[in-house]
């Protein structure tokens, strides 16, 4: 049996799916046609019902749950893993002046409209409306060249923004943790409801096995991860994996499900 499967080229996703899609584990007769795209594209495809299995932002879950089931394995949740709002030093005279009113007047780059990052930003700044939606890896440059006043960054940009002379206004993930007392639900894996539930459970278990295989061979970074890592260093790849792949990736559990449910009620 062959199914379509979509996820991002980011190290956490390629780390999770490497063993599964490259047949490093026994996939029990199941194979995949793989599509790697940025998270906003994945979210749009999910709304269209395009993929059998896909990574999505939890921010879009309310728009797709009628046609997809959420898997327990393969997701990204945790503590200290949220998006950051960053800017150039001197945009406002001093960091303590980054008030709600000041942010409301700024043009903000967001990594996609239907993303968890956008949802978390809107939770912290509900009256900020000057938004520009961009692919996540374009946001640092948009801030640096003055196209926008500030930007919400995700993924590996958490590890690079300071080296490029940018500064943090707020950690949106920390804001979520402080206000909700739950881990940050960033993204999860979904399966079409039209697929046999037994097969969905089988794939869920295979993703779990794929993650365990990856960890058994870590900290060596697999060629599949390096191939799709967009010129980042192996140290940054490991930072990325260490931050985003954890026990919640193996199994959402009750705390993970509670976090997802809370996010989708906002």
Where in this protein do the model-derived segments appear?
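Beta->alpha turn/N-cap motifs
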Residues: 12, 38-40, 49-62, 135-136, ...
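A short beta-strand-loop structural module common to alpha/beta enzyme folds
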Residues: 27-41
């Amino acid at each position: 049996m062959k199914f379509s499967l979509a996820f991002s080229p980011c190290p956490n996703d390629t780390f999770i799916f490497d063993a599964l899609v490259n047949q490093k584990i026994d996939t029990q007769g199941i194979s995949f046609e793989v599509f790697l795209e940025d998270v906003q594209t994945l979210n749009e495809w999910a709304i269209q019902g395009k993929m059998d299995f896909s990574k999505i932002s939890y921010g879009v879950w309310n728009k797709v749950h009628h046609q997809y089931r959420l898997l327990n394995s393969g997701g990204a949740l945790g503590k200290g893993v949220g998006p950051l709002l960053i800017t150039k030093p001197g945009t406002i005279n001093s960091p303590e002046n980054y008030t709600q009113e000041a942010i409301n007047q700024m043009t903000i780059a967001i990594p996609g409209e239907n993303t968890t990052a956008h949802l978390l930003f809107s939770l912290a700044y509900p009256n900020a409306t000057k938004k520009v939606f961009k692919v996540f890896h374009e946001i640092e440059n948009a801030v640096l060249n003055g196209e926008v006043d500030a930007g919400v960054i995700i993924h590996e940009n958490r590890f690079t923004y300071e080296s490029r002379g940018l500064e943090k206004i707020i950690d949106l993930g920390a804001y979520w943790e402080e206000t909700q007392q739950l881990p940050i639900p960033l993204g999860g894996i979904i399966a079409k409801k039209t697929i046999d539930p037994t097969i969905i459970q089988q794939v869920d278990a295979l993703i779990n096995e794929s993650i365990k295989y990856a960890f058994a061979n870590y900290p060596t970074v697999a060629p599949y991860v390096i191939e799709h890592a967009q010129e980042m260093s192996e140290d940054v790849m490991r930072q990325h994996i260490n931050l985003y792949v954890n026990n919640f990736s193996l199994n959402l559990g009750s705390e993970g499900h509670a976090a997802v449910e809370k996010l989708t009620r906002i």
